[in-house]
UniProtKB/Swiss-Prot annotation:
Catalytic residues (UniProt): C158
Function: Involved in the biosynthesis of the nonproteinogenic amino acid monomer (S)-3,5-dihydroxyphenylglycine (Dpg) responsible of the production of vancomycin and teicoplanin antibiotics. Catalyzes the Claisen condensation of four molecules of malonyl-CoA to yield 3,5-dihydroxyphenylacetyl-CoA (DPA-CoA) and three free coenzyme A (CoA). DpgA requires the presence of the dehydratases DpgB and DpgD to facilitate the aromatization of the DPA-S-DgpA or DPA-S-CoA intermediate.
UniProt keyword Transferase, yes or no: yes
Pathway membership: Antibiotic biosynthesis; vancomycin biosynthesis
EC number: 2.3.1.246
Recorded catalytic activity of this chain's protein: 4 malonyl-CoA + 4 H(+) = (3,5-dihydroxyphenyl)acetyl-CoA + 4 CO2 + 3 CoA + H2O
Protein name from the UniProt record: 3,5-dihydroxyphenylacetyl-CoA synthase
Positions of transmembrane segments: none
Signal peptide feature range: none
GO biological-process terms attached to the record: polyketide biosynthetic process; vancomycin biosynthetic process
Catalytic class of the enzyme: transferase
Keyword list, A-Z: Antibiotic biosynthesis, Transferase
Taxonomic classification: Bacteria, Bacillati, Actinomycetota, Actinomycetes, Pseudonocardiales
GO molecular function annotations of the record: acyltransferase activity, transferring groups other than amino-acyl groups
Length: 370
């Protein structure tokens, strides 16, 4: 297959999804799921008994209306009980598997496929640690063929969905005609700490539960979804400690840490990654018709918009997902892709950029074409 003819841009060695392979991976279907209960930011402030005006301001100025969460049990004295780490790990397992199964079902339905068609399952999570991994638990829960190959990406954070897509795109190119799925399942409710500090308040104001699945396949010209052309990665090693999920000795549990400078760090480096992504393709930034950016938070999205010269329309799905769900971690860009797909505004030949950001600090991007 002459890939340069099918993509409309000159294929260079750098542009190959996997050097030496001629098959191009396409998106075949997408599905999402959330946990059972949602709350407005005001409701959460009341439920958690938050009175500090600075913390209340963080919640109310987040550009988030609602989030889906599984809150801790009620405290008879007011607020919610602090859950021990063991209970949080149990919560992660239960919620991540439940949401993951439902997102996978929706994804396969979108792709016109069944569980028996699935040949590779790559599961992504950073909100809990499981051995056996999430992929094994979902294969057992759904009765997927035990011969299905699988992989798990754990602990890479909000950028990990694109890392997984990179892996599965390579697998797909090597297995034309076979269906692979990237499944991100993040039970952010299982990663909360309630200690009244500003550090945890920022996290507690931002993240929500969500799962997203993307089916991909190569070698099938009947699939109408966009093709994956190229990936670019960048790790800002000077900011390796700026986003962390590590052990809090005072809380006796894992907890998130987000440096206030993160939006500016991400924004300042976004152009570097876009330029590398488009290098050798003959494309300019103005040729990109669709931007699907991780809903990392209001300030992060604003920094990306300013530094890449995007419009609010360009990131309408990003801000819409943030408003309706909060930061869903690794799968949030797929929630945005699902909304773009439902709009039915893409046309053959259109280019899109997927962008995720996370710990490292890391920026991941992918170039796609309809």
């Amino acid at each position: 297959m002459d890939v340069s003819m099918t993509t409309g841009i000159e294929l260079t060695e750098e542009l190959s999804v996997l050097n030496g392979l001629t098959e191009i991976t396409r998106f075949a279907g997408v599905g999402t799921a959330v946990s059972e209960t949602s709350y407005s930011q005001t409701e959460l402030l009341d439920i958690l008994d938050v009175e500090d005006p600075k913390i209340r301001s963080v919640f109310l100025n987040s550009a988030i209306d609602r989030r889906f969460l599984t809150l801790p049990p009620e405290n008879p004295g007011g607020g919610r009980l602090a859950e021990p780490q063991g209970d949080l790990l149990d919560k992660h397992k239960k919620i991540a598997v439940d949401m993951g199964c439902r997102a996978l079902e929706a994804c396969l339905k979108s792709a016109g496929a069944t569980l028996s068609d699935l040949r590779h399952l790559c599961c992504v999570t950073s909100t809990g640690f499981l051995t056996p991994g999430l992929s094994a638990l979902i294969i057992r829960e759904m009765g997927i063929d035990p011969h299905c190959s699988r992989s798990d990406i754990v602990g890479m954070g909000c950028n990990a969905g694109l890392n997984a897509l990179n892996v599965v795109s390579g697998w797909s190119a090597a297995h034309p005609g076979e269906l692979g799925v990237v499944l991100c399942s993040e039970a952010c409710s299982a990663a909360y700490a309630l200690d009244g500090t500003m550090r945890t308040a920022v996290v507690n104001s931002l993240f929500g539960d969500g799962s997203a699945a993307l089916a991909v396949i190569s070698g099938d010209g009947r699939v109408a979804g966009p093709r994956v052309l190229k990936f670019a990665s960048y790790i800002i090693t000077d900011a390796v400690d700026a986003m962390r999920y590590d052990w809090d000795r005072d809380q006796d549990r894992f907890s998130f840490f987000l440096d206030p400078q993160i939006p500016y760090v991400v924004g300042a480096h976004a152009e570097i990654v876009v330029d590398r992504l488009l290098s050798g393709t003959g494309l300019r930034r103005s040729d990109i018709g669709h931007w699907l950016v991780h809903s990392g938070g209001k300030k992060v999205v604003d920094a990306v918009v300013v530094n890449l010269g995007l419009s609010r329309h360009d990131v309408r799905h990003t801000t819409g997902v943030l408003r309706d769900y909060g930061n869903l971690s690794s799968g949030s860009f797929l929630f945005s892709y699902e909304r773009l797909s439902e709009e039915d505004v893409t046309r053959p030949g259109d280019y899109g950029v997927l962008m995720t950001m996370g710990p490292g600090s890391t920026i991941e991007m992918a170039l796609i074409q309809w």
